[in-house]
């Protein structure tokens, strides 16, 4: 952090002094030129991004418009859309101490008529889940993880999906609330090209190892058995062939995070290879607002979905809420409706919806296909 602050004060600030904050692309390009590396390795993506976001906020203030409106203008987007929240309500993978291999089990209230109704649905399912977990696994299992989700001692992915489905039914939202998953499969990809669903238990007998073909079958089963509509990082980040196969089958949205890292170069490659059909947008992976807009533009032109995302380690900053509305991403992933740094984003989205009044449009059933 001190190095990033030092780079901002000593190198970036003097170079940008006097530039117009409304001219986001010019300023972002200036910082990229100052850095001079492909991966922003000299000044650091976190230093460059902090300035890029601050400039974006200053540009909105100079124009006297809300941040989301300024972002929409920068992107040349005329549609302000409230996104479908993808609440991470059960944690597994490397984020949790249970036996669950897959990292996130999420709910998406696509059947809501407004963002505020989607929030209510999400909260009700979340609390129904808490009741089920308490009854089945005990009070201890109700502790929450980094992103506000529960991490009960679930033994299998099927058990996790079943629990989420049960909570949706208990809350009375069958058909209106769907399920999403972040498999984060690179975490349990083995040297012999297999996927070890028992990777947390080492050493193990290898009975839970699966081939890419078996993983493909497993995802098909999940989508048939449960209302799963979105799967993120289903295969290892460089294992593009089975990922493309799953995308072609068109049984759900296939989201690229590790495979794309919000990099326009990798996005272009994935579009050509038809490897996935949705972009996970993490601004700190690419490092500037301009490049983030470019990645979203490419994704939308390819007919992809876009999910704006937080990070596991978050702050109270709500910038990504405005970003999701301004870029009409249609989806946002920023944790469970729990923990203040997660709710900060949801509260900002509620404020934006209120501010837009009768002009507020919720993505709802169109969550995957919103053009500019």
Curated annotation (Swiss-Prot):
Substrate binds at residues 95, 104, 232, 257, 309-312, 333. Transmembrane segments: none annotated. It holds the Pfam family Enolase_C. The keyword Metal-binding applies. CDD domains: enolase. Pathway: Carbohydrate degradation; glycolysis; pyruvate from D-glyceraldehyde 3-phosphate: step 4/5. Mg(2+) binds at residues 182, 232, 257. One of its GO terms (cellular component) is phosphopyruvate hydratase complex. Keywords: Cytoplasm, Glycolysis, Lyase, Magnesium, Metal-binding. Homodimer. This is Enolase. It comes from Chlamydomonas reinhardtii (Chlamydomonas smithii).
């Amino acid at each position: 952090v001190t190095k990033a602050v030092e780079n901002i004060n000593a190198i970036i600030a003097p170079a940008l002094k006097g530039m117009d904050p409304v001219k986001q692309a010019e300023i972002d390009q200036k910082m990229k030129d100052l850095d001079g590396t492909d991966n922003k390795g000299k000044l650091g993506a976190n230093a460059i991004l902090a300035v890029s976001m601050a400039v974006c906020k200053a540009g909105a203030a100079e124009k006297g418009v809300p941040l989301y409106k300024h972002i929409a203008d920068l992107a040349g987007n005329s549609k302000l859309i409230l996104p479908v929240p993808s609440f991470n309500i059960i944690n597994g993978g490397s984020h949790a101490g249970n036996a669950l291999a897959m990292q996130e089990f999420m709910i998406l209230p696509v059947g809501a008529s407004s963002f505020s109704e989607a929030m209510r649905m999400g909260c009700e399912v979340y609390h129904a889940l808490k009741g089920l977990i308490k009854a089945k696994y005990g009070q201890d299992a109700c502790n929450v993880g980094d992103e506000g989700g529960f991490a009960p001692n679930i033994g299998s992915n099927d058990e996790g999906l079943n629990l989420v489905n049960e909570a949706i039914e208990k809350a009375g939202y069958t058909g209106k609330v769907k399920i999403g998953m972040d498999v984060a499969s690179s975490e349990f990809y083995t040297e012999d090209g297999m996927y070890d669903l028992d990777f947390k238990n080492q050493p193990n007998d290898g009975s839970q190892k699966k081939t890419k073909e078996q993983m493909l079958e497993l995802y098909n089963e999940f989508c048939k058995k449960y209302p799963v509509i979105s799967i993120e990082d289903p295969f290892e980040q460089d294992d593009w062939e089975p990922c493309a196969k799953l995308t072609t089958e068109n049984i759900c949205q296939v989201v690229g995070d590790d495979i794309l890292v919000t990099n326009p170069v990798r996005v272009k490659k994935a579009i050509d290879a038809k490897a996935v059909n949705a972009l996970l947008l993490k601004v700190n992976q690419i490092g500037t607002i301009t490049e983030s807009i470019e990645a979203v533009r490419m994704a939308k032109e390819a007919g992809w979905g876009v999910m704006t995302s937080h990070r596991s380690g978050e702050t109270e900053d709500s910038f990504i809420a405005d970003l999701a509305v301004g870029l009409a991403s249609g989806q946002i992933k920023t944790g469970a409706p729990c923990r203040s740094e997660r709710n900060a984003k949801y509260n900002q989205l509620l404020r934006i919806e209120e501010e837009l009044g009768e002009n507020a449009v919720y993505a709802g059933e169109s969550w995957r296909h919103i053009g500019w």
